Structure formats: C-alpha cells, structure tokens
C-alpha cells in the first residue's frame, strides 16, 4: 500500500478516476518487477509519518524529499532530482531570493520550503514577513494568483505543471532554495528490507531507459531529473 497526496504531475487522479503520474507509473513498473501489485491511497500528508509507522501504509511515495529526513525513514532512492524553487506573479518586482525580505510567502505545510523559511537555517534565504502554511497545495497557487501573498515555494516540476494546467502567468526565480533527491520512505521499524530491493530496481530502471521513458511523458528534459549522482558531489 503506497501513500501519497494529490501532487501533479507526480501523483494525481486522472479523468477516469485512476491513480496517475510520474510516481504512480514508476511504482507500478518497479513493484511489478519485484512481484508486488501496488495499491495507491490518498493520505493526509501531515500525518504521513504516523501512517507508515503504524503500518496503515507500507511506504510514502509522492515527490518526497530525502534531504534533512535521511534518518527519519528507511529510504529507497533517491531516484530523481528536484529543485525547490520560488515563484512570483509575472508583474512582481521580486527577481532574486534576497528580494523576499519582509515579504509574505505561501508554502504547503510539512514540506521542505516550509521548513527552510520558518527555521531560517540557510543564509541565502532571507527573513520573510510571514509564512502561510497551507494543507491544500492548490491554495498556495490561488493565494498567489489573487495577490494575497508575494511568492510561493514548491517543487519546480509541480509549479510548472500548475502553470501549464491553468495557464497561470508565474515567473520562477533563477536561484533555487534547495536541490534535493526524491525517494520512497519506509518506516524505521520496517525490517522487511523492501527499500533495498526497490533501490536496486529503480537504478535498473534508470539504466535500461524505462524511467526516462516514463518521465518524458510529463517533463521535457527527463535526463536532467535522473542525474541523482550530482547529489553525491
């Protein structure tokens, strides 16, 4: 049982009511190679750690960043690179991260951008006036579109997907706030070792081109997102 939340293009429900997206397709292929049939469930993202630790789900697989959470879970991957970025309205005078000083930003709750802006541990991220943490990711985009906030921060692929789906006129800042790997999280108390086999399977899928084939359906420069070796530098 795979837990995730609605996060296009990684994880969403298609027009026929079926699970779809990058992570869904990767999971189906990887687990079928391993002899499992995945079942996808939508979870309360804020409660993900409890759900996996209690065994209500077997793993968390939905564009989940490894960085800073390395010791919280047993990880498979990282299988993809992701850039956490800041987006503003086209007309905004914000062009670089330092321009965010004393501005209002919206993020999805329990995500890396929320942590980065609230904890202020990275010197390149200025102190903002206010951080709005929203459980529903759609609300961050609505807040920006209506001008309630000055900026939003999220995974670049997800922002670009929203811009494409809704013809939203946002501008993504050149400086990212974090380059991170995305992985599949299993509970620390899970002794089955599935994550090790899954890591090997995902690597094999990158090697044989099947991961790239899946990504190409959703993003234009698939190779860029599979260069996870750059995280080891």
Descriptions of predicted regions:
Residues 47-50, 63-72, 116-119, 143-179:
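A ligand-binding cleft/hinge motif common to bilobed small-molecule-binding domains
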Residues 21-33, 94, 98-104, 109-112, ...:
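Extended ligand-binding regions for polar small-molecule ligands
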Residues 12-15, 27-36, 113-134, 161-167, ...:
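Ligand-binding cleft/hinge of the Venus flytrap
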Residues 1-22:
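Short glycine-rich His-centered loop
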Residues 4-5, 81-88, 164-203, 221-233:
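Periplasmic-binding protein-like
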């Amino acid at each position: 049982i795979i837990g995730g939340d609605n996060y296009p293009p990684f994880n969403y429900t298609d027009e026929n009511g079926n699970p779809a997206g990058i992570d869904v397709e990767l999971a189906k292929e990887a687990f079928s190679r391993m002899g499992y049939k995945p079942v996808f469930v939508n979870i309360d993202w804020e409660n993900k750690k409890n759900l996996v630790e209690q065994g209500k789900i077997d793993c968390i697989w939905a564009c989940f960043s490894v960085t800073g959470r390395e010791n919280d879970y047993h990880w498979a991957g990282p299988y993809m690179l992701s850039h956490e970025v800041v987006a503003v309205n086209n007309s905004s005078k914000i062009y670089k991260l330092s321009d965010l000083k004393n501005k209002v930003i919206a993020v999805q709750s329990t995500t890396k951008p929320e942590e980065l802006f609230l904890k202020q541990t990275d010197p390149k991220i200025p102190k903002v006036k206010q951080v709005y943490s929203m459980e529903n990711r759609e609300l961050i985009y609505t807040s920006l579109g209506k001008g309630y906030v000055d900026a939003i921060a999220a995974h670049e692929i997800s922002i670009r997907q929203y811009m494409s789906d809704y013809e939203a006129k946002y501008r993504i800042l050149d400086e990212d706030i974090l380059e991170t790997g995305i992985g599949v999280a299993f509970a620390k108390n899970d002794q089955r070792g599935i994550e090790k086999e899954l890591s090997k399977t995902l690597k094999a899928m990158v090697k044989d081109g099947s991961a790239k084939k899946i990504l190409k359906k959703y993003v234009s420069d698939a190779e860029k997102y599979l260069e996870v070796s750059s995280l080891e530098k």
